[in-house]
């Protein structure tokens, strides 16, 4: 059996500035190579097989040897499914991935694995055939530097670490064909139980693990706890493997040939006794049976592991598994610190609130790195601030777990109270422009605060001065304030006496604030605005105050504009507007027609002469109206004929009151009914004299008088 007893000069030069690591008394076999033109590492695991352990007998050394037994050589071209697991497997999972870190530097591939089992690593390479020794202890006696890294603790039961090896080595030397894999395993101290596994084969092929399992009957469960964190590893030397540093032992003329396909080396570990094994991060002796591989596991020293925990460093392309116990511990510390900061922050906020500050309070509670923020108005924030302060004080005294539940309950109750009040208060018309902007988040209203008037304060917010003592002393304060706000809202939304419900008049409240923007008006529904004097508050003044500002329709003259503008107006109001528009148009048309008629009368129909008017026959109206025929009333004055009235008849045989027709003929020489010219006898006489009496001429007064 060959052993490395000296350190190479090159390694001595590189490690001169670092602590000397005790060299193991044996070696391990690595087979490195390239596959598919890419540098790829293949790792197979199996628990060590039965062999009597060899005590080193050294004082101060607590590590024990790995026991190896017959390792069957298997060649697998494909992956085997996980359903081959024997039914005798305990209820715990077959394996759990523990913390594994594989930093790469140059041609060295170092790996630290926290696990409860001992492993055998096989590294395939292009170097044709390597022999290995059996029934001897092989140790790779070399020193290497470990790239700094931090591993988080994990609790693994029946745990076997699976190595995810990157196919590319970013810092590697392309001229080298050999990469070396070193596994460092740690088993927890004394009082831990270890479970024996049977013929379990784990194969990591192309980053996929498969288990070939034939388990022995279940034994006492093994609870493997690894250390929380490694020490700062910059100065801690670990194993550096190279092709020249590995020495193999030829025994029994057995050889293992590298196959072009995936190779799998299985190891079995069997512990029939209840002995407890401790494997520290120190050089270990490994025993190898005939034709089998013995793997050296180089780990850190126990004393060095008890050092201060370094800050975790995130490595690329390395999977890290953090145990739930460590996560709970860290989150507990974070929550406790966050609650302490929250207590201090809310105390300061409470002092600012009591000093009369009008700024909004921003409530931010840190839970597991997340921020739950809520913007509060001063009257409501006072309640939640006091509650949060009391609960946070209780939290700091009682603990992080109970305090968190109370803080959560108080926080969400405060959210419900605040948003319930906020929803009821945002529709209130009593909230002026300045108050609206003050209720906005602080980061949005900060630029507008300088523009607000000096007399703007929180006193205008309903319920502040009256409810402030109740809110601080009594837990039922928000409910009372909620009732008062709802009553005030009902009074604000109720219609004033005499106000028309379907036509709302919006007045601009110029005295409330000097700000130019009016956020509250953005939520108002579009409607027709009347003049400042037309409030329409009295029903009796509706007919007098309906002077609508028609200039508002100028921008909505066509199509969709009118539809959008009047879509929110009551139909009765639209009907009235349409009727008024029609009446106005009809009046304009009638006046124009009358003006045209007046001009025509003056030009075409000159007044009748006084002689012709005096020459009209007069008829005395009798009781039976036989003298005037069927006429019952005068067409000019529209009054009925009564007894002893004097009527006259025009040549067109239309009867009128003589005074009425005389006035008409003085203005126009036509019949008011048929527009026939008067006097026709004069016109006919001038045109053609006729000896025959005119049948249309009215009868003489004598004949009328003699008729009765």
From Swiss-Prot:
One of its GO terms (cellular component) is postsynaptic density. Its main location: cytoplasm. Gene3D superfamilies: Zinc/RING finger domain, C3HC4 (zinc finger) (3.30.40.10). CDD domains: RING-H2_PJA1_2. The modification N-acetylserine is found at residue 2. Pathway: Protein modification; protein ubiquitination. The keyword Membrane applies. It catalyses: S-ubiquitinyl-[E2 ubiquitin-conjugating enzyme]-L-cysteine + [acceptor protein]-L-lysine = [E2 ubiquitin-conjugating enzyme]-L-cysteine + N(6)-ubiquitinyl-[acceptor protein]-L-lysine. Residues 531-708 are annotated as: Interaction with PRKAR1A, PRKAR2A and PRKAR2B. It is found in: Cytoplasm; Cell membrane; Endoplasmic reticulum membrane; Golgi apparatus membrane. Pfam families: zf-RING_2. Residues 550-570 are annotated as: Mediates interaction with TBC1D31. It is a peripheral membrane protein. Keywords: Acetylation, Cell membrane, Cytoplasm, Cytoskeleton, Endoplasmic reticulum, Golgi apparatus, Membrane, Metal-binding, Phosphoprotein, Synapse, Transferase, Ubl conjugation pathway, Zinc, Zinc-finger. Has E2-dependent E3 ubiquitin-protein ligase activity. Responsible for ubiquitination of cAMP-dependent protein kinase type I and type II-alpha/beta regulatory subunits and for targeting them for proteasomal degradation. Essential for PKA-mediated long-term memory processes. Through the ubiquitination of MFHAS1, positively regulates the TLR2 signaling pathway that leads to the activation of the downstream p38 and JNK MAP kinases and promotes the polarization of macrophages toward the pro-inflammatory M1 phenotype. Plays a role in ciliogenesis by ubiquitinating OFD1. This is E3 ubiquitin-protein ligase Praja-2.
């Amino acid at each position: 059996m060959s052993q490395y007893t000296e350190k190479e000069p090159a390694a001595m030069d590189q490690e001169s500035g670092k602590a000397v690591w005790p060299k193991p008394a044996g070696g391990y076999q690595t087979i490195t190579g390239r596959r598919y033109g890419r540098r790829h590492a293949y790792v197979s695991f199996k628990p060590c097989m039965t062999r009597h352990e060899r005590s080193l007998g050294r004082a101060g050394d607590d590590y024990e040897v790995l026991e190896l037994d017959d390792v069957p050589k298997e060649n697998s071209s494909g992956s085997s499914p996980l359903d081959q697991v024997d039914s005798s497997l305990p209820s715990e999972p077959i394996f759990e991935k523990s913390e594994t870190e594989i930093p790469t530097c140059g041609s060295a591939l170092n790996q630290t694995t926290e696990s409860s089992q001992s492993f055998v690593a096989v590294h395939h390479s292009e170097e044709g055939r390597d022999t290995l020794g059996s029934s001897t202890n092989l140790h790779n006696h070399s020193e290497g530097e470990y790239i700094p890294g931090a591993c988080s603790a994990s609790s693994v039961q029946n745990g076997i670490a699976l190595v995810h090896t990157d196919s590319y080595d970013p810092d590697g030397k392309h001229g080298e064909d050999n990469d070396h894999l070193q596994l460092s395993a740690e088993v927890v101290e004394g009082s831990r139980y270890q479970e024996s596994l049977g013929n379990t084969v784990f194969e990591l092929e192309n980053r996929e693990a498969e288990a070939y399992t034939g388990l022995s009957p279940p034994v006492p469960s093994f609870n493997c706890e690894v250390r929380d964190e490694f020490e700062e590893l910059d100065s801690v030397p670990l194993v550096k493997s190279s092709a020249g540093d590995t020495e193999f032992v030829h025994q029994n003329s057995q050889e293992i040939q590298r196959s072009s396909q995936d190779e799998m080396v299985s190891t079995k570990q069997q512990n029939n006794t209840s002995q407890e094994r401790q494997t520290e991060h120190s050089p270990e002796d490994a025993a190898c049976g005939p034709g089998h591989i013995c793997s050296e596991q180089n780990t850190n020293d126990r004393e060095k592991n008890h050092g201060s925990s370094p800050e975790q460093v995130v490595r690329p392309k390395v999977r890290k598994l953090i145990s739930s116990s460590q996560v709970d511990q860290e989150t507990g510390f974070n929550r406790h610190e966050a609650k302490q900061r929250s207590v201090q922050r809310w105390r300061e906020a409470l002092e600012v609130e009591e000093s009369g500050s009008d700024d909004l309070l921003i409530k931010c509670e840190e839970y597991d790195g997340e921020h739950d923020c809520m913007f509060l108005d001063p009257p409501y924030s006072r309640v939640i601030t006091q509650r949060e302060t009391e609960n946070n004080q209780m939290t700091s005294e009682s603990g992080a777990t109970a305090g968190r539940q109370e803080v959560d309950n108080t926080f969400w109750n405060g959210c419900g109270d605040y948003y319930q009040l906020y929803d009821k208060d945002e529709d209130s018309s009593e909230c002026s422009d300045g108050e609206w902007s003050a209720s906005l988040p602080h980061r949005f209203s900060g630029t507008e605060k300088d523009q607000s008037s000096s007399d703007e304060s929180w006193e205008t917010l309903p319920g502040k001065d009256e409810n402030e003592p109740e809110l601080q002393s009594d837990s039922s304060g928000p409910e009372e304030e909620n009732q008062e706000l709802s009553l005030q809202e009902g009074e604000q939304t109720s219609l004033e006496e005499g106000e028309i419900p379907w036509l709302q008049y919006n007045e601009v409240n110029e005295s409330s604030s000097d700000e130019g923007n009016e956020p509250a008006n953005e939520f108002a529904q579009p409607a027709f605005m009347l003049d400042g004097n037309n409030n329409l508050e009295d029903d009796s003044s509706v007919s007098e105050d309906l002077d609508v500002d028609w200039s508002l329709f100028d921008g909505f003259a066509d199509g969709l504009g009118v539809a959008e503008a009047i879509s929110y107006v009551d139909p009765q109001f639209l009907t009235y507007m349409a009727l008024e528009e029609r009446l106005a148009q009809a009046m304009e048309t009638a006046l124009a027609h009358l003006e045209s008629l007046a001009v025509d009368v003056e030009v075409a129909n000159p007044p009748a002469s006084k002689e012709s008017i005096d020459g009209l026959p007069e008829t005395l109206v009798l009781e039976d109206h036989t003298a005037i025929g069927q006429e019952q009333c005068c067409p000019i004055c529209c009054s009925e004929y009564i007894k002893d009235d004097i009527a006259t008849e025009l040549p067109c045989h239309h009867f009128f009151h003589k005074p009425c027709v005389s006035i008409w003929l003085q203005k126009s020489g036509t019949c008011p009914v048929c527009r026939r010219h008067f006097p026709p006898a004069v016109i006919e006489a001038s045109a053609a004299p006729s000896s025959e009496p005119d049948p249309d001429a009215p009868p003489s007064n004598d004949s009328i008088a003699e008729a009765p």
